[in-house]
């Protein structure tokens, strides 16, 4: 179910504070966050945000096309190793 329009988009306040602080100081360090649920705002464009995927922080460079999406969409939590290869000797 989508978020109600009357509520508006959500972003973690600490993440907004970190982005505003770096924008003010013209600094482009990687911002670490655990907030996968935060919506990407236009103020985030040009920053690299390291999003936690459960094991490590995945660096995500924010572009204009990402605005409106969630940070967690760009840091996959599951790794697909491929389907098992079928053994041709056993199959008849």
Swiss-Prot record:
Keyword Protein transport found: no
GO cellular component terms, semicolon-separated: cytoplasm; small ribosomal subunit
Stretches that traverse the bilayer: none
GO MF, any single term: rRNA binding
Database matches in InterPro entries: Ribosomal_uS19, Ribosomal_uS19_bac-type, Ribosomal_uS19_CS, Ribosomal_uS19_SF
Keywords: Ribonucleoprotein, Ribosomal protein, RNA-binding, rRNA-binding
Entry keyword Ribonucleoprotein: yes
Entry's Gene Ontology BP terms: ribosomal small subunit assembly; translation
Described function: Protein S19 forms a complex with S13 that binds strongly to the 16S ribosomal RNA.
Family classification: Belongs to the universal ribosomal protein uS19 family.
Protein name stated in the entry: Small ribosomal subunit protein uS19
Gene name per UniProt: rpsS
């Amino acid at each position: 179910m989508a978020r109600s329009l009357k509520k508006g988009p959500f972003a973690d306040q600490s993440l907004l504070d970190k982005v505003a602080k770096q924008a003010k100081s013209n600094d482009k360090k990687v911002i670490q966050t655990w907030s996968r649920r935060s919506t990407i705002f236009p103020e985030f464009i040009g920053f690299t945000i390291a999003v936690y995927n459960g094991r490590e922080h995945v660096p995500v460079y924010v572009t204009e096309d990402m605005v409106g999406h969630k940070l967690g969409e760009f840091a996959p939590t599951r790794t697909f190793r491929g389907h098992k290869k079928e053994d041709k000797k056993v199959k008849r």
